[in-house]
């Protein structure tokens, strides 16, 4: 493994550790963004399982959205993942933006999830 990859791996581990410390047992809302779609899932790290998930590929959203890669799609995914998390009994989460800046689609997803009842 090259030095660059080792440094990236160390940084990822450090970020995951910091999120686990701040979580205090709360599930985390993890975001993945690709060029065409956006995905969000609520993960319980203690149990190692996904409690709720949503993406711009979901059938209901896909037909209603023009594209899966804009702020409107991110907001719709945020609202949907918040509704599914509340159905699973989760109201408090820790936001895990990964390496993405809190800007644009990631911010739109987070704000929509907050407005729909998730607390973070």
Swiss-Prot record:
This is Large ribosomal subunit protein uL18. Keywords: Ribonucleoprotein, Ribosomal protein, RNA-binding, rRNA-binding. InterPro entries: Ribosomal_uL18_bac-type (IPR004389), Ribosomal_uL18_bac/euk (IPR005484). NCBIfam families: L18_bact. It comes from Acidiphilium cryptum (strain JF-5). Belongs to the universal ribosomal protein uL18 family. This is one of the proteins that bind and probably mediate the attachment of the 5S RNA into the large ribosomal subunit, where it forms part of the central protuberance. Part of the 50S ribosomal subunit; part of the 5S rRNA/L5/L18/L25 subcomplex. Contacts the 5S and 23S rRNAs. SUPFAM superfamilies: Translational machinery components. One of its GO terms (cellular component) is cytosolic large ribosomal subunit. One of its GO terms (molecular function) is 5S rRNA binding. GO terms for biological process: translation. It holds the Pfam family Ribosomal_L18p. Disulfide bonds: none annotated.
